[in-house]
UniProtKB/Swiss-Prot annotation:
Tissues and organs where the protein is expressed, per its UniProt entry: Expressed by the venom duct.
Gene Ontology molecular functions: ion channel inhibitor activity; toxin activity
Subcellular location field: Secreted
Source domain of life: Eukaryota
UniProt source species: Conus ventricosus
Protein name: Conotoxin VnMSGL-0111
Length: 75
């Protein structure tokens, strides 16, 4: 193999490694966001239960400091 062929192969290898590393980072960020949404969505307090009970609904969590009251929660 000539020096040029080795350089081209090395460059291709580096590009493929960099691309796969970026894809992995995006997947990690997506998983982290999904976990954060899950944690926020299950935040419930006694005040939320009481508030929703007055409306004959179920407390499904708190968003922006306000209770989320619906007929039934979807998990």
């Amino acid at each position: 193999m000539s020096g040029l062929e080795i350089m081209v192969l090395t460059l291709l290898l580096l590009v493929s490694m960099a691309t796969s590393h970026q894809d992995g980072g995006e997947k990690q960020a997506t998983q982290r966001d999904a976990i954060n949404v899950r944690r926020r969505s299950i935040t419930r307090t006694e005040a939320c239960y009481e508030y929703c009970k007055e409306q004959n609904k179920t407390c499904c969590g708190i968003s922006n400091g306000r209770p989320i009251c619906v007929g039934g929660c979807i998990r």
